[in-house]
Each structure stands twice: as structure tokens, then as C-alpha cells.
């Protein structure tokens, strides 16, 4: 089961890794990311850079999947805890355990019988304890169902709705695993009923309250960050685009999720780096360039500061 549903990393170039820049030691803070000024034309007489492997476009559609929550963390807890988004709607149904989940820059606690719906492209990450159980429903890239346009966090306290939601998810999974003719189509019909369940129960989300100004700004920041984290922009650039000061943006992020604006940015970039290192054979220099770093050495220092090991050591560890 493929758990990562951004650009299909397995389709990246599978050329042998090219020679990479020497890796720097130490834990310096992330630096050396490209800015608009650093992306200009090369100086006259500069050597022409050798072309690096290209990253292809993602497919337009992906299948519906139901995945146990425990399996999402296979390969490392960073796969669920780091900030990221996926290009398809997602429902997390927690049936046991508790922890914290951050969606759109806002952190809340979750417990048993909590349903969290995350629209495509929405940044999220969550902590899961050893006793956390449930399922993740991936609606598929290209999903045309009428689904909520904003995230929902539903605390399902009544037994009836709990059983209804669990039954819908079981029906989807049963069809997908049956191998019978029309199973995919039947699963999508059950998925449509799941969308209706979200619509009916979503009316009570957050007690009908609209998000305050801080939460709206945090959501706008994470939405902007998700679209531009590869650009090399810093917090000051995002703050300018949002019409606020970097200090105010950082204060708001600390208020809504307990993390600074810079921490959210770096977490998102390094998550993508981890995925590219673990799921592709792209050279480290190509990954650094794709994520907006000015050199492989700067990328190595930033990665080691967050991940505790160099990019090549992380890749070797699998």
C-alpha cells in the first residue's frame, strides 16, 4: 500500500547517484536557501552546469485506500509527525488512544472516537502514542465527491454515529479487499456515503464557532507555505505576503500550535527531503536544488540539524 500520495516518488529518476558534495559536520541552523536574488542569470564566463535528473508530474488520479493508523508510521515516526500535506482528501478515525494533531497551523488534542477530515493540500501532522488505533481513509487524488472544503475535527460522543462511521469504513475496506467484479466502484459508493456522514456530522464541528483571527492567519500561512516551501523563501517573505510582521506571524503560530513560524517552515522542508531521500535515488545535490538550497553543503547542515544525521547516512539507514 502506498502511503505517500504527493508526487509519486518511485517514479523519480532511477539513475545511479552522481558524485555529491562533501557533507558538512555539525548542527548549524538551516541556512543557504535560495532567494529571488540568487536565482538570476549566471555570470558571464561561468561554467555551464550539467543537467540533473528531472522530477516528473504526479498522475491525475490515485485509488481509494483504507490503511491502519499504525502502518502510517512504518519507516519512522517522522512520516506522521512532521508537517506535510497530501494531494487527496484524508480522514483519520481514531478509535483508541490520545495525542495531539496539528491541522492548518492549529493544534488540538484528540482522543478515542475522534474523526479528523483533512482536505487535499492542507498541512498537517500528528503525534500517536503506542495505544493509538484506528484507520486512515485516503479518498484518492482526483476525487470528485462533494466533501467539506475546510478541515473538520469531530469528537463523536454518541454510540450511533460512532458505529455508523466504523461501519462505513469497514464496508469500504471489505470491498477493496474482496477482489470481486465492481469492487472499486462499490467502494466509491460507500465513500460517497462517508461524505454524507461528514456533511451531517460536520455541522457540530467546533460548536459552530468560526475560527478567530489568529487561527485564520495560521491557516493562511500554512497554505502559502505548502505551495511555496521549495522556493527558498524565509519567514520574512511569507510575513510580507500575508501583510504582517515576522514577529507577529511567529507570535500567532506559537499561540495556535506551540511552534514558531520558522519551525513549521523547516519541518515541512525537511519532511520533503526525507521522503525524497528514502523513496528515490535522486542525487543529494538534485534534492538540495529542488528544495531551494543554494548548495548541497548548506542542505546537509540544515538536514543534519533537524534529522540528527547527514542526508547520505539517512539514506543508507533506509
Question: Which residue stretches match the model-derived regions?
Answer:
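…primarily DNA-binding HTH/wHTH and HhH modules…
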Residues: 1, 26-33, 37-38, 42, ...
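A short, Lys/Arg-enriched amphipathic alpha-helix from helix-turn-helix/homeodomain DNA-binding modules
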Residues: 209-242, 247, 264-282
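Basic, amphipathic alpha-helical hairpins
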Residues: 174-181, 197-205, 221-234, 252-253, ...
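N-terminal regulatory/effector-sensing and dimerization cores
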Residues: 61-152, 184
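Amphipathic alpha-helical segments enriched in hydrophobic/aromatic residues interleaved with Lys/Arg
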Residues: 150-202, 222-223
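Append "Primarily bacterial transcriptional regulators
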Residues: 113, 237-244, 249, 253, ...
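Membrane-cytosol interface segments
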Residues: 2-58
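Terminal helix-turn-helix DNA-binding modules in bacterial transcription factors
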Residues: 255-295, 316-318
